[in-house]
Amino acid sequence: MSLAKSAANKLDWAKVISSLRITGSTATQLSSFKKRNDEARRQLLELQSQPTEVDFSHYRSVLKNTSVIDKIESYVKQYKPVKIDASKQLQVIESFEKHAMTNAKETESLVSKELKDLQSTLDNIQSARPFDELTVDDLTKIKPEIDAKVEEMVKKGKWDVPGYKDRFGNLNVM
């Protein structure tokens, strides 16, 4: 137990979040857990620093009704702390941990898949021929519908591309 306390005290939460590159709901949940942990630790230290002994003789000298003091003193002497079964809370924590790990693994797989896709896109961009070196045959090989559209326009006697003059202006000299 002392080893766990020592490790918990030495844990640098900011470093954990940044070094593991945790983001999103996982980082939010981890930060809220840290906040609750710090608050509980602060309350524990505050309660431990308070005195636990009651000076009943002082109250007997101050109050006239000492029978009340005797009764309270007997209750205090009879008091035994109750041991609480923390297994339910531990089960909740374990289920939360499993859920968090599942979310983290899903996030990791999504990120790695996206990185692979981005890397392949980057490789395609870097290995592509410059635009000025492309030929019409290259374009029709990539998009065969271009060739079909041009053939259809020639059959119908349309020699102008729709919207070309609107976009680029009329380049006729005459």
From Swiss-Prot:
GO CC, any one term: proton-transporting ATP synthase complex
Keyword Membrane: yes
This protein's UniProt keywords: Acetylation, ATP synthesis, CF(0), Hydrogen ion transport, Ion transport, Membrane, Mitochondrion, Mitochondrion inner membrane, Transport
Pfam hit, one: Mt_ATP-synt_D
SUPFAM superfamilies from the UniProt entry: ATP synthase D chain-like (SSF161065)
GO biological process, one term: proton motive force-driven ATP synthesis
GO molecular function, one term: proton transmembrane transporter activity
Subcellular location field: Mitochondrion; Mitochondrion inner membrane
Subunit-structure text: F-type ATPases have 2 components, CF(1) - the catalytic core - and CF(0) - the membrane proton channel. In yeast, the dimeric form of ATP synthase consists of 17 polypeptides: alpha, beta, gamma, delta, epsilon, 4 (B), 5 (OSCP), 6 (A), 8, 9 (C), d, E (Tim11), f, g, h, i/j and k.
Membership in a protein family: Belongs to the ATPase d subunit family.
Record protein name field: ATP synthase subunit d, mitochondrial
Organism: Saccharomyces cerevisiae (strain ATCC 204508 / S288c) (Baker's yeast)
